Swiss-Prot record:
Xref: Pfam families: Ribosomal_S18
Entry GO terms, CC: cytosolic small ribosomal subunit
Gene3D superfamilies for the chain: Ribosomal protein S18
Keywords: Ribonucleoprotein, Ribosomal protein, RNA-binding, rRNA-binding
Name listed for the protein in its UniProt record: Small ribosomal subunit protein bS18
Species assigned in the record: Vibrio campbellii (strain ATCC BAA-1116)
GO MF annotation list: small ribosomal subunit rRNA binding; structural constituent of ribosome
Entry keyword Ribonucleoprotein: yes
PANTHER family per record: 30S RIBOSOMAL PROTEIN S18, SMALL RIBOSOMAL SUBUNIT PROTEIN BS18M
Stated role: Binds as a heterodimer with protein bS6 to the central domain of the 16S rRNA, where it helps stabilize the platform of the 30S subunit.
Domain of life: Bacteria
Subunit structure: Part of the 30S ribosomal subunit. Forms a tight heterodimer with protein bS6.
Gene: rpsR
């Protein structure tokens, strides 16, 4: 029976030495929301707890300022 080996998840923000996640950096934030507009959990992305909190706060701020949509297209 074949086993599947998954790559170990790591926090990209820790690896890059990011101090604070900026809410104006929409390109980075888009990688951490789904097509439906939900915030992707850290168990999927591998983001550490510290940066997951900053990420959620930044996404919510950018949504409030209309830099990111709350959902995708309403139809």
């Amino acid at each position: 029976m074949a086993r599947f080996f998954r790559r170990r998840k790591f926090c990209r923000f820790t690896a890059e030495g990011v101090q604070e996640i900026d809410y104006k950096d929409v390109a980075t934030l888009k990688n951490y929301i789904t097509e439906a507009g939900k915030i992707v959990p850290s168990r999927i992305t591998g983001t550490s707890a510290k940066y997951q909190r900053q990420l959620a706060r930044a996404i919510k701020r950018s949504r409030y300022l209309a830099l990111l949509p709350y959902t995708d297209k309403h139809q």
